[in-house]
Amino acid sequence: MSSLGETLFLQKVLRQESGVPSVENMNPAMIEGLARRDMRAVAKAYVDSVRYRLGPEPIFIEKLPFNFLYLGFIARAWPDARIVHLVRNPMDACFSMYKQVFTWAYKFSYSMDDLARYYVAYDRLRKHWQSLLGDRLIEVQYESLVTDQESETRRL
């Protein structure tokens, strides 16, 4: 298994493959453009862009927190993939972000009110994708992973 870390490759490829010139991560025109695309070609473009960072195994981790926004595209691009999603206690997740100084992203993390609203929206979207993807979306509780890593790893 290879770890790509936290990269922007997915957003870059989705933006390019949408056919819509934009500096935004995603907008309605881009979603419409991607809806008409063969997502396997999008998956190939993504893998081609990160190939130099991959190991020999076909399994890799891309851990950018914003990737939950793209679960629908990820599921279509890799129809056989299982997606591991780490879920943390809301208070702990929000406080962890609040006390961290980020250089370029997560501007909402500097206000507890904004963090709370963002987390609620994230949780609604997470539940939506869980209902559609079923067992393809494997949720791992952060706290369980920390306290019993071996059992959680075996479950995966």
Residue ranges and their predicted role:
Residues 1:
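Glycine-rich phosphate-binding P-loop
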Residues 38:
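Catalytic cores of large soluble enzymes that bind and process phosphate-bearing ligands
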Residues 4, 8-35, 47, 51-155:
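PAPS-dependent sulfotransferase catalytic domain
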